[in-house]
């Protein structure tokens, strides 16, 4: 429940964060399909004997090369199979949290028997689309998710339609928090962060708790490309400085290593992505620890980071050719700048420099290499903050950066939303040719 004395706009900000910053176990694209399969299995009369699935090209792109937690296997077929046989239909993005060793073995057996198929939905106008149909003999159940990783729009069985999401909005219904957020500004977000009661945003500290645990697991060196663990070793060997900049990169990339390598620990996601949640969280946590910030100061910095990341990503397609670790790191830059300096000018300069630095990074699907992009984005964020502290930034005379940070963000998002659509198609074509 909200404090009734809170500014209504602030209430919408908090709702936006609560909707977009959630625990997620495993990369969220295959997990979206696993959820569809789990919900379908819950509707099926009898045990699952066969699974069919269809996904959008973008979801296929992000599901081809990522490890599904607990399985040691990559790809959408194992996600669909495990969701159907061991998923918790009520757990959202943590659908696989209760999967047992037996369920994993059964899912692998179903896969080996050729009873699982995943195809691209054609035609498909949706960026994020997953549909799972599970069978028991002639009986079946089918679930469709569209637009958001957990947004179930249709449930149907051989007996008929169970549920269909109504597209219309009831008269007098409040606008969604993201719609409200689309009309705000970074200056208004900063005012909120500075003035909102700590008790109203204390919950954001959970992002530090979850993502720090994931980072610690990643430092074991067992996961993914073990970038964080490797860089930590290089510090011990004297090849990399043991300083704040290194700590930011090491601890952030370690969390992504564990995330993408299939560790069975949840990440606190942002905008439907664990890596975005990690990127918006870990750099801020490391800087807060460096300065000895208390819980309230950390919570305000994390709220600024996560809300800024959501604000920017809300102007993008849910999935695109632009690596969204870059936009999440713009949020992190804001949070770190606030911890060190607190001024709007420093925050806006840091974000502008980020846009002038890493905005061209492509998303070529979810995989272990995402941790490389996460580490690059985290490093760029801290560099941008250091520049801003010295009153230096990429200016409006250069490239897509404008004189106003809001216009710079709009320019970046226009590039991703329009011109990079062809880039996205080319990436998907290249990846599909590799999978043949």
From Swiss-Prot:
Family classification: Belongs to the UPF0597 family.
Bilayer-crossing regions: none
Underlying gene: yhaM
Top-level taxon of origin: Bacteria
Official protein name in the record: UPF0597 protein YhaM
InterPro entries (alphabetical): Ser_deHydtase-like_asu, UPF0597
Gene Ontology biological process terms in this record: L-cysteine catabolic process to pyruvate
Organism, scientific name: Escherichia coli O139:H28 (strain E24377A / ETEC)
GO molecular function, one term: L-cysteine desulfhydrase activity
């Amino acid at each position: 429940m909200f404090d009734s004395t809170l500014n209504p706009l602030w209430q919408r900000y908090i709702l936006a964060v609560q909707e977009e910053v959630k625990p997620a176990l495993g990369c969220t694209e295959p997990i979206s399909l696993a959820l569809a399969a789990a919900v379908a299995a819950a509707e099926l009369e009898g045990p699952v004997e066969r699974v069919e699935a269809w996904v959008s090209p973008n979801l296929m792109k992000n599901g081809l090369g990522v490890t599904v937690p607990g399985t040691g296997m990559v790809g959408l077929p194992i996600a669909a199979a495990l969701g159907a046989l061991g998923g918790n239909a009520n757990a959202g993005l943590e659908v696989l949290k209760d999967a047992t060793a037996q369920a994993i073995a059964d899912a692998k057996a179903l896969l080996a028997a050729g009873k699982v198929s995943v195809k691209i939905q054609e035609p498909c106008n949706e960026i994020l689309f997953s549909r799972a149909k599970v069978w028991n003999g002639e009986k079946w159940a089918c679930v469709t998710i569209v637009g958001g990783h957990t947004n179930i729009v249709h449930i149907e069985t051989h007996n008929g339609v169970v549920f269909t999401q109504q597209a219309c909005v009831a008269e007098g219904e409040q606008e969604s928090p993201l719609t409200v957020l689309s009309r705000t500004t970074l200056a208004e977000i900063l005012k909120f962060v500075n003035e909102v009661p700590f008790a109203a945003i204390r919950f954001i500290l959970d992002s530090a708790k979850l993502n720090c645990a994931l980072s610690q697991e990643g430092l074991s060196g067992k996961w993914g490309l073990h970038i964080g663990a490797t860089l930590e070793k290089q510090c011990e060997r004297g090849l990399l400085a043991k300083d704040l900049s290194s700590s930011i990169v090491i601890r952030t990339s370690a969390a992504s290593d564990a995330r993408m390598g299939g560790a069975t620990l949840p990440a606190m996601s942002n905008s439907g992505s664990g890596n975005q949640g990690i990127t918006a969280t870990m750099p801020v946590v490391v800087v807060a620890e460096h300065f000895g910030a208390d819980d309230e100061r950390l919570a305000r910095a994390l709220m600024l980071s996560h809300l800024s990341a959501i604000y920017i990503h809300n102007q993008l397609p849910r999935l695109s050719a632009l690596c969204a670790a870059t936009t999440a790191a713009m949020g992190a830059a804001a949070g770190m700048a606030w911890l060190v300096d607190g001024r709007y000018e420093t925050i806006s300069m840091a974000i502008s420099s980020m846009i002038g630095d890493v905005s061209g990074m492509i998303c070529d699907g979810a995989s272990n290499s995402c941790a490389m992009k996460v580490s690059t984005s985290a490093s760029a964020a801290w560099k941008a903050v250091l520049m801003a502290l010295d009153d230096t930034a990429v200016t409006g005379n250069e490239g897509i950066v404008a004189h106003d940070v809001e216009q710079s963000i709009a320019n970046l998002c226009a590039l991703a939303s329009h011109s990079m659509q062809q880039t996205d198609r080319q990436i998907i074509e290249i990846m599909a040719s590799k999978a043949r």
